[in-house]
């Protein structure tokens, strides 16, 4: 897949490509800023790591649901109308999120528990509405770009999704320069800048329909694609990808900040790995031309597993940077290349199959990734402190209990108390505070090591697919020939 010729089908293809790029960039900015201010929320409102994981998980869950719904209605409602809806949801999400502080302050003196719960609801539903806006954009721009550039899907979907790490970089820099100096509410508002830009770019140009819709493929025939075992396997793998990439991204600056003993350094490391992703995604075309999309996915998943394992064991700043580099390079091409593979191999599915991939990935990140990694941190840290210093654990444990799926109920460490310890210099901490901090740090390290098993499993799945396609003469793109019920998928 050469990137030398766009082979686009519309004269306004590049304007729509960059409008989609800005929409995904807006999602990345908002996601990054929220990740950077998790510590502020924990300290201000007394949330545990599991509480914070559930808040971030709510955002990713909403993201996933709307991608699925949006994919089903995109061609019927129209891409332009859906982008306007996304803009409205982004605006409302800011209003609800910003309401958390005044509501909390008005209640905390008379009802501390109620104030905490009210703040939690504001942040959760604000995140959920933010995710609805993100999901609506995602439901539109993925099939849009795959349609605009039918012979270069992997290359241009990677360029489209360079907007995500670009947004993470912008949001991370905002957090780095403003953390501890500017209220989190002001940081939250800044993601509206790219929102306004993509909204303006979407006014005017005509949006095409997907390849499947152009060939008159019915909804029933689109849905029949899900009977293919390979598509079901790819959906399962993409669910794992959502867990490891987005679930980890929602925690990574927090965890590495603790490892580096500097919240600001954790944010800078996050910005660094996101910058790598941003730059490398513009070069997916030449790489895929040499090793195929599945080869790229296998290498990426393998690097991701190695990077997370090393990151969980790193003890010096240099080792943390090296480990994060391996992880960052590994995850760079996974998400957009998975979307491209599904679009190339199952074109009759149209927006529905590519939307299902994005939706499943986001749902997995929201339901399992964010909460699961938060739970793992709480579980390991609380058990470590409980075993070594039971009385100290009783002093620092949260007032509330948390549960994740079928795993045991736990009482994590109180976010406000642990946050106060983190804010102190090492020399200012008491021996007891050092012990609590060590348990907190250990929980973060082990959570990263546990997560490394997910990309390792993904790498095995990609290897099996590579071996399968070798028996079929190699990986090849599929196109639609014919119209209506006569439409068939043919290898080109």
PLM region spans:
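Extracytoplasmic
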Residues: 15-49, 142, 248-256, 369-370
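C-terminal ends and interior cores of transmembrane alpha-helices
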Residues: 88-116, 303-315
